[in-house]
């Protein structure tokens, strides 16, 4: 997946990579591996069932989320399209970010002290952010997320999270990752 790719948007290689991560996740099946190039991905679309499968449409709704399907591996930190070696992988040099900051307007905390972080968490300007950035539901322990930073989620009381046909009550939890009846593996990820 690479938002800079210019090809067929079918995921067959880096030149034809899906430009929308949610499109790649919508067609992923158990055993598939999705590679995420450097960049920021926002869950600003949702899946809709259509006669021959699912399609992903833009919406910008706070309830949209990345849904990691059962048995699917999602790896970040790749150089991606346009690089001399698009398969080069270094999660520190090629940061892949799943961000709930749908409007791209979050301001980072002023410092690492308790008060700065407390003020950041309670900042109402983030109320337009995605309620849950990533959702894993009924996936057992076969799903893997590796090499991503997850940021910008803003869960709200009595909210529902929707994605690829699944709905779960996120309530006040799960701003970064909302996990239901699953035990996915997160490797070298930051929240």
Question: Whereabouts are the PLM-identified features?
Answer:
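Leucine-rich, hydrophobic repeat-scaffold detector
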Residues: 161, 190-191
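Extracellular beta-strand-rich solenoid/capping regions of secreted or surface-exposed proteins
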Residues: 22, 26-30, 44-73, 81-146, ...
